[in-house]
Amino acid sequence: MLNIGIFFGSKSVEHEISIITAQQVLSSIDRKKYNVIPIYISKSGEWFTGKVLEDLETFKDFDKLEKKAKKIDSFSVKNNKLLLKYGLKKQTIDFCFLVFHGTNGEDGTFQGMCEIFGIPYSGCNHFSSAFTMDKVVTKLLLKEKEISVVDFEYTTEINEEFFKRCEKNLGYPMIVKPARLGSSIGVSKVVDRKNFEEAVKNVLLFDNKVLVEKWINAREINCAVMGYKNIFVSELEEINKKNDFFNFEEKYFKKGKKFSNHIIPARIDENLKNKIKEIAKDTFKILECSGNVRIDFLIADKIYVNEINTIPGALSFYIWQKSGFTFSQIIDNMINMGLERFKDKKIVSIDTNILKIKVGK
């Protein structure tokens, strides 16, 4: 039986969202197939494990969490396995199932560690995770491949020239957002210069790279894509938004309306549905994704790819359920795809005695 480590939390403004997704995974994973080990990374970077981490109430008081959970003192790697040490005990991890959202987890950092240590893991590889985390890099690449994206500007240097360039090239209203965050955190719609400057200040609380997009009156359609060698595309989800865009409050703080904003299948004709699915598959391939990804679209005069989520909230299970997959099947597929990718890795070292060769001056 495989020892599956469920990794979540980490130093991210989406920390709490990661905890929620992890609880859903922990309650849905098939424990007849896997030995499940929850591993929580705190906002300060400390690692914890223990059964207590499977209770959402544990995370409401960090002082109690520290006392109840087992703090991991150190870890090492042997034979493509992660060895965790806490007190006098050790725990072997055969596979890292990643449920991070945002920076220091979803962005290729943890994936890179797994690559260096030679440990199999779920989701996109370190390369794909890193550049899809940056909305600007993603848009530039998709645009190069003739995938439609909304007109945009970006900067890491806030000055008058940037404000004027956006006003000239995009015009009001505009959408201002952090380039490397998800969950709609820090996103604002601006209608004048005062709004614009305030929105940029807000973004700078979260990220030093600002993305500004032309606002368009569009329908929001989402699509989940899962695969490694064989690619599956889900039913389409329509967001029934109350505001001009689906913001953080609507996503997570509408009591009693957990998924009432999600209309599945989307209310669109078959021809448009097929076009969106084809673009979703193309985007997945262009960005070299693997695992389970959600691609968000804006539908107006064109089909625009808006954002890519390489570890989507709740693993997009609510979309996949409408496509015939249970939550546990989604988890199984992600584990199997991660293991298959690990087996397919190319040889990265060769035997050589080059260091024994004498090199003349």
Curated annotation (Swiss-Prot):
Class of enzymatic activity (EC top level): ligase
Pathway per the UniProt entry: Cell wall biogenesis; peptidoglycan biosynthesis
UniProt GO BP: cell wall organization; peptidoglycan biosynthetic process; regulation of cell shape
Catalyzed reactions per annotation: 2 D-alanine + ATP = D-alanyl-D-alanine + ADP + phosphate + H(+)
Organism lineage: Bacteria, Thermotogati, Thermotogota, Thermotogae, Thermotogales
Organism in which the protein naturally occurs: Thermosipho melanesiensis (strain DSM 12029 / CIP 104789 / BI429)
Subcellular location: Cytoplasm
Main subcellular location of this protein, as a coarse class: cytoplasm
Protein name, UniProt field: D-alanine--D-alanine ligase
Family under the similarity heading: Belongs to the D-alanine--D-alanine ligase family.
Stored PANTHER family: D-ALANINE--D-ALANINE LIGASE, D-ALANINE--D-ALANINE LIGASE A
Keyword list, A-Z: ATP-binding, Cell shape, Cell wall biogenesis/degradation, Cytoplasm, Ligase, Magnesium, Manganese, Metal-binding, Nucleotide-binding, Peptidoglycan synthesis
Keyword Membrane: no
UniProt-annotated binding residues for ATP: 167-222
Binding-site list for Mg(2+) 1: 296, 307
Gene (UniProt): ddl
EC number(s) from the headed UniProt entry: 6.3.2.4
A UniProt-annotated Pfam family: Dala_Dala_lig_N
